[in-house]
Amino acid sequence: MNLVQVNIKSGGYLKKDLILNDISFAVKSGELVGLIGPNGAGKSTILKTVMGQLPYMDGKIDFPNAHTHYAYIPEQPVLYDNLTLWEHLEFAAAVGKMSRETFVSRAEELLKLFRLYKEKHRLPVTFSKGMQQKVMLILGFMMRPALYIVDEPFIGLDPHGMRDFLQLVDQVRQDGAGILMSTHSLDTAEKICTSFILIHEGTIISQGNLEAIRQQSRLPEGSLFDCFISLLEMQS
């Protein structure tokens, strides 16, 4: 089942300065779709378009189920200066109309998983970048939406944090959620994504599972990195 269908003819922050062209894809239940490309390729702009945050867009973003909820986990943590970690979680639960019992259970489980339980009454603005990234992951996964939109989740995460994130990804996929994740960490993406959308200068240069990407790049046994470089060379 499609959780979101994206058809962007063009898009940008100004109508006269378009960044995206001919972007079409879907994210299905149980999928982890990797939005792959270098810095400045348009990955974050695509995510903003999916969420309706791009000032100009010619196209359509369709959520087939009108009741589909999504969680957005940004690359840069967004935190309140005067709220403790626990108060951040309480605020998110209140916005999501989560019962107190469900909130406490999920919050404590995630805090323990990411080894932040002892820090729950501290101010996250004083945390390291990696710890702040874990806070954003906890906030997103606590809500258990049907769709996760994740922007560069690996930046700042230590190996334990990355393992915990990947464990949660597997769990929510098994529960039927879909994930759209942007990253330029091709080695990790190759291991965990079910399909890929390769972006260059705001345009899709290839998409599909790894086998399809290999066929399109004419590298039958190539890594995702090698395939991406080959496709870029074909564009030039």
Predicted segments, located by residue:
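A short, flexible loop at the N-terminus of ABC-type nucleotide-binding domains that lies
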Residues: 1-6, 10-22
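The feature captures the beta-strand-to-loop junction immediately N-terminal to the Walker
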Residues: 36-38
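Conserved ABC ATPase signature
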Residues: 123-130
